């Protein structure tokens, strides 16, 4: 089986028991809650990627970031003969609510980006049915049982429609 590597940088923002998430519109995590963040651009530092991606996906700048850590998952989509080794850098982030929220880029608003709007989701609602493996890593961390080893998701089901259950 072929394994493809993917590296991304993501923000973890928790307020009053709710996690800042974005709704993925494409890819293996579509129609699930995911963390704001994504791939580095050529020559971009980790925190530069973090700031750019959070701004692009939420419209907010960061007032601070801390606690960098790394996790990884192996995701094999149902019916595919390859898997993606998703390596992720997480930072705890605090959004700058003092400044005005920037308008989301045209690509987010017109649906050509891989994410839609930002939402605050209660941690207890995070299940494999509703959340990406990244969010599940954060949930385990918040429950005091961080998954330090690579987590494998074989036969990952890509959702082709948004779930209507809560």
Could you describe each region identified by the protein language model?
Residues 1-2, 23, 108-109:
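Short, flexible, glycine/charge-rich loop motifs used to bind or transfer phosphoryl groups or to couple energy/partner
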Residues 18-56, 161:
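Conserved Nudix-box catalytic region and its N-terminal flanking loop in Nudix hydrolases
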